[in-house]
Amino acid sequence: MKRVIVIGIFILLACSGCNALKKTWNAMTGKDLSGTAQQLAWTGMDAYEDGEYKDAIDYFQQLKDWYPFSKYAILAELKIADSHYHLKDYEEAIFAYEEFEKLHPRNEAVPYVIYQIGRCYFDQIGTIDRDQMPAHMAYETFQRLEKQFPNDKYARSGSEHLTTCVRSIVGSEYNVGVFYFKSKHYKAALHRFMTVLSDYPDVGYHQKALEYIARCEAELSPEERAEVN
């Protein structure tokens, strides 16, 4: 079983491309670390690989609490965040990932960590009639990842989600405009449709926004139209 766990950890390190975590892996095979810390790491990985994420969090948290300066601790920090993500405890996962980035800003796992923060927000995107905060936050996070690490594979993965974020945001903006129009709040509606047109021209709402802009302008005086423009 321990061999299976070690293989799982090796796969994790290979996928992350993280030198610091690889050093952790090297340390795990050495003699300088506490057997108890090592056992917590192995048991935590065993639980994680088996999908027992709550148990994994418990083991890794014990490792952090009892051996905060252990070379295992960095692995525990990351797997706590990953476990929360798999449990869909997105708020806790975001906090853990952000703490990792803050504590280890030069760690090579940071692109993965930023990507996971974006995924936490992205996975909460609902229908266009719901709060668009997750879409906005996912978009901003993936944009930050692309800017900071333009050549990283996680930046490329994040960029693939940007269109979905934008479509959710613009769909909500358009729907609010339609609501205002039907409520005869034409100036407010016009403002929404103008925003769709100017800020999001290429995501499928261009023609529909133009049609509503014409209908709103027909209901407004020149002075009212000028206020919006």
State where each predicted segment sits:
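Bacterial Sec signal peptide processing site at the extreme N-terminus
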Residues: C15-Q39, D50
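Alpha-helical segment of the N-proximal tetratricopeptide repeat
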Residues: L33-F69, D82, H86-L87, G126, ...
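Short solvent-exposed coil/turn linkers within tandem alpha-helical repeat scaffolds
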Residues: W66-A73, E101-P111, D129-Q132, Q143-E160, ...
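Alpha-helical linker/edge segments of TPR/alpha-solenoid repeat scaffolds
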Residues: H86-E91, R119-D131, T164-F179, R215-N229
